[in-house]
């Protein structure tokens, strides 16, 4: 049924309303943050996750089509959000964790779905907005060696908050994600604020 759904139209319905609100706030000079969730979390709100995991094992080709459709819609939405003035996109697939998926399934999902999608978004958004990853997603990327942390390089003596780090990183990094977005007001030493660098596709080819 999911595959039978039409392509997301960002100019109609709730998506259009959200994007219009983002546009108004951006025009008023606000730094707009938009929350977006990943495929597993979206599917969790639609069907029993046991059916999803069974499909990933028994019918991976079908599930790949489902993931790709969701990712295509997410891509359209995120690009439209940036065009509307959004500067930070909070992105996470919080249901995609070891306790829920198990280490083997999570590793495969991270390497085969999460990493390629985030690479795609980094290319499409061209650092016009920062993607602030949920720490659970960031840890999964680091744990599978799909990404690494790099200091933002903030000036010493600024006593920044985590939120200050986001603003500094816009246009310089594609991703951050060392802490939850709720910790935005927490002060962090300059040298402890990190951007996230995705593993290059060329590194994978070399390993193979």
How would you name each of these model-derived features?
Residues 1-7:
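A contiguous, low-structure linker/loop signature
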Residues 10-208:
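Active-site loop segments of alpha/beta catalytic cores
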């Amino acid at each position: 049924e999911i595959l039978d759904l039409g392509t997301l139209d960002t100019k109609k319905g709730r998506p259009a309303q959200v994007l219009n609100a983002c546009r108004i706030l951006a025009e008023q000079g606000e730094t707009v943050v938009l929350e977006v969730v990943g495929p597993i979390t979206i599917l969790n709100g639609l069907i029993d996750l046991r059916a999803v995991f069974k499909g990933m094992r028994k019918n991976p080709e079908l599930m790949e089509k489902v993931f790709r459709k969701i990712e295509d819609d997410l891509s359209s939405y995120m690009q439209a959000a940036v065009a509307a003035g959004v500067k930070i996109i909070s992105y996470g697939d919080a249901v995609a964790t070891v306790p829920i998926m198990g280490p083997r399934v999570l590793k495969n999902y991270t390497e085969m779905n999460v990493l390629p999608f985030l690479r795609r978004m980094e290319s499409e958004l061209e650092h016009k907005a920062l993607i602030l990853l949920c720490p659970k997603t960031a840890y999964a990327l680091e744990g599978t060696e799909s990404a690494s942390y790099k200091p933002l390089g903030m000036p010493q003596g600024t006593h920044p908050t985590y939120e200050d780090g986001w603003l500094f990183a816009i246009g310089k990094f594609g991703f951050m994600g060392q802490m939850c977005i709720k910790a935005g007001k927490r002060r962090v030493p300059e040298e402890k604020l990190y951007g996230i660098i995705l593993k290059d596709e060329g590194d994978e080819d070399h390993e193979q």
